[in-house]
Amino acid sequence: MLESFLRYLNLCRRKYKYKKISYSLNAVDLIIDYIFKNKNNGFYLDVGSQHPISNNNTYLLFKRGWSGINIDLDKKNIDLFNTARPNDINLNLAISSDVAEKNLYFYHDKSPINTLDKVVSDFQAATVKEIKTIKTTTLDITLQSLKLNNKIDYMNLDIEGHEMEIFKAFDLSLYKPSVISVEFLDLNMKYLEFKNNDLQRIVNSDLYKHLHNNNYHFVNWLHGDLIFVHRDFRD
C-alpha cells in the first residue's frame, strides 16, 4: 500500500514538474513555443496585443527572455504594457491599410472586440457604446519610423476582422516574420463559432491565399487562430 502511494506521489510530482502553463486564450503560445524549440532571445511583433499577460500570445515568450513590439489602439491597454513590460516597445496606434481618419466601433475601455471594421461590428451581439474617429497608420510606416533592425521571429495579429487591411500595407517580403499567428473571422460562418469553421473555408479565404502567395505554409489551427510558418524557416 505504501509503495503504491509513493509511486502515485512520484507520478504527480513528475506531472507537475513538466506541466506547461499557457497564457493564450487558446494555447497558441504553447504551439509557438514548441515551434521555436525553447528559443530564449527572440523578437516578437504583436498587433492588437490587448493585455500584457491575460489571453496574450507573447507573454510566455516574454517570460523566456524575448522582447518586442506591442501595438494596440486602446491607450489603457498600452499603459498596462508599459507597467508590465517596460523594456518592450509599446505603441498606442490604430494600424490599417493607410494613413487616414476612420471610425472606431467602441464597446468599452480594454474591450477585445473594439474594431475598425463596421461589418464585424454589426455582426457582434454586443452594442456599440460610441463611434469614435481615430487616425490610422500602416505597419510599414510604423516599423520604418522605429528603424527596426531586429529580425521578427514571431508576429501575432488579432484586430477583429481588420487583418487583411493591415497586410495590404505590410511588406512581408521585407520583414518576413518566421512565424505568424492570425485571427481568422469569416462572417459567413454561423455565430463566428470555431465549431462552424472548416478547412475548405480557410484555404478559400483571402487571408490564406495572401500568406500562401508570400511563401507561408499553414501549419496549425487553434480555435480562431491560424498559424503560418515561412518557407525559409521550415527549410
Residue ranges of each PLM-predicted region?
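Phosphate/nucleotide-binding beta-alpha loop and adjacent structural elements of enzyme active sites
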Residues: 1-235
